[in-house]
């Protein structure tokens, strides 16, 4: 689960991570009031008006601007709220700005990058720091890897003090700035582990002219599988920032990702789903979605899966690819038949069922009287999809 910058900063503040003073605003009037309050409380000469969307690259797209007065903050907010912000992470459709973060300005002396995430190759959390603050960390890793330090964290011991100090040394900090950076990194790691985050990224981390180490921006992503342990954070979810198809799928515990093709896919198991999309592509088609109905697919989940696939008007054919291990193919076949009858399917539906009770399932489909196309293997299924689209 992704959350907004201001929400992430509110969480980090509770763990002792230093963040600027800021106030969220939902209108130009609220932005003006927030600016007046920040000017009065901080003595800053400027405030920063920041669009709140679930995407990076906001500054280059005009989503981060400075205001030297409450009136200027009002005018910027008036133009920004309701605008569609297009960045390299939003795609060409962009995201509509519905809220802003009004934040105190900072006298920036240095900019760095600090992030913590899970390294799946080593099954360990990794602390990453870079002297290239404000840059995409993927670009830094590819073009100037010598400017990026990765520190593997032993899950048995957690991050140790010497590792936080190693990171601060790498950034070239000394004296009070060094001590502040060590404390910052330690607090960030505590927050990351305590809330079961999948990503805690500060970009940029800045050192101010007063020597303070502050998170100028913050990205916090939660591990969905651990959210049941943090129900207080579930209310932070902003479904308006998510694809409506994916939101609907999550209500039925379906793992769905919308793509831009025309072949709807319904598969059980993430690995098989990715393999299915690959072979559709190899056969000349384009998958319209990733849809994993899970290892215990039932007639109900199959029916819900069809509803979600068919809600995408770009879909011109559907491929159902089920391997029956725990799940019984005859139960899935029952779900396919029920869905086909209820929804009056007019699109070609190619079905490949293998595994437990596959022969029974095949017989059920053959005798159903429905125009379902049976496939004998994955390659045959992909070929039949292409024939149906021709």
Swiss-Prot record:
GO BP terms in the entry: succinyl-CoA metabolic process; tricarboxylic acid cycle
Positions annotated to bind substrate: 268, 325-327
One GO molecular-function entry: succinate-CoA ligase (GDP-forming) activity
EC number: 6.2.1.5
Alphabetized UniProt keyword annotations: ATP-binding, Ligase, Magnesium, Metal-binding, Nucleotide-binding, Tricarboxylic acid cycle
Residue span(s) of domain ATP-grasp: 9-248
Pathway the protein contributes to: Carbohydrate metabolism; tricarboxylic acid cycle; succinate from succinyl-CoA (ligase route): step 1/1
Residues binding ATP: 50, 57-59, 103, 106, 111
Protein name: Succinate--CoA ligase [ADP-forming] subunit beta
Name of the gene: sucC
